[in-house]
Amino acid sequence: MKKKVPSVLKEIKEKVLPQIDFATQKSISYSQLSMFNDCPKKWSLQYKEGHKQFTSTIHTVFGTAFHETLQHYLTVFYEQSGAEADRLNTSEMLEEKLREEYKKQYKSNNNQHFSEPGELREFYEDGVEIIRELSKDKTKYFGKRGWHLVGCEIPIVLTPHSKYQNVLLQGFIDVVLYHEPTNKIRIIDIKTSYNGWNKKQKSDENKQFQLIAYKKYFSEIYNIPLENIEVEFLIVKRKIFESENFVIKRVQIHKPAAGKVKLNKVTKSIEEFIEQAFDRNGFKQVEHQPKINDNCKYCPFHKTHLCSATY
């Protein structure tokens, strides 16, 4: 018997979000904010001046393929059953998605290879092991009784600054769950990693802010009280190192603080970015300066005529 869909899920799924008019409006994302905070000049070159740079890597290929495979597994798990989800050939699915995504990024990389078969095989085998552990302990990581899948890649579109109606923030949330008995929403951001996050990575506000921003904007768009929304990172490890003392898991859960202080900090950061980068007519006509630091050597504009700081 099919589960009855709670009214809150229907309301979220039927919500009509604003369409961006690219002739008169600008679209921003959290990645733009992150880049601007790292180096305003790099953001300006990429987004304002149109020198778009995207470097295809095995990590971006694996990240996309893994997300899509796990999201499909979770969709079947919640909308059908755990048994049906376990009957999926996720190994085959992951392999197909890795091939598809590699071909896609190969074409966008001017038909230049950026990995080799052995590396692709290694990432594939790592992904198979991660999904095997997740499926084995699925109720531990996701829960079943009383839980519903709101959806995967849930859209966020809104004007984050009331004085700049021409600037819209756009994003997608990896996984959103709803717990009917407590009326709670759970926002999950899936992160692929080499061997997990250490203390420094967990405390990195640049990582936290995107998830906290999604909590704030999900609340505003879908009319869910902030106190009813929980956020967490689901961090999956490609590599684990054996220990004689305890079992090392491939899955790590991190729940960052997302209360009033952090929410206000995120709001201020986004509003300041908009104020510095835009005006009511579009991009603000100012010269954004480079922020010179150790990361400059990794920048695609490093030692090019486009950046005076390193040329």
Q: Model regions: which residues?
A:
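RecB-family 4Fe-4S metal-dependent nuclease core
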Residues: 1-311
